Amino acid sequence: MRTPLVAGNWKMHKDHREAVELVRELDGLLAGLEGVEVSVCPPFTALSDVARTLEDSGSPILLGAQDVYPAPEGAFTGEISPRMLRALGVRYVIVGHSERREIIGEKDDLVAAKARAVLEEGMVPILCVGETLEEREEGKAVSKVQGQLEAALSAWTGDEVSTGLVIAYEPIWAIGTGRTATPEDAQEMNSFIRGWLAERFGQDAASEVRILYGGSVKPDNAGELMAMP
């Protein structure tokens, strides 16, 4: 039985003081919550303080990071290694977010390397996949997502997929725009992704993978989206 996961990507919001205040507030609001995992992904500058706050309070909230560089160390100015994140107690790492693909120009091979590096450091990548509005309107949404999955997971085994992977479907046209895919749209892609995983890695492995939806999720639509199987 998959445990639902709710992950919050804070993007470039909150300095380290504001992040600590927010995670303390969240921790209080989530007291007694059962049957779901919650992860927060603050900016890099706040990771250490948020990690310490979660540890000191014994919070069940799991720490996540927004990105990573696929090397253990070296002359990579401005980058953060998987080992550094693991040392802070990070559990989940977002890789391939559409904003990094679109704004920074990250390609599938780099996303694949990041996902592998996160896995090998004992953390779980949240692999982001999704299509543009143009691709959806041209009927290419499925082929786009399939290409991203194949590029990122070509070297993975069924055991690795079943224990070390989360996939986030994030239609690019719905991110930060106020537009949201309908629950039926999200479920259609969810079904395709799980079917692709089953064909590639076997039904048992596919059934263990948690598939998230991201894209203008709000309190008034979260329930409908979470209700999709």
What are these regions (language model features)?
Residues M1-P229:
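Active-site loop-to-helix "anion-binding N-cap" substructures in soluble metabolic enzymes
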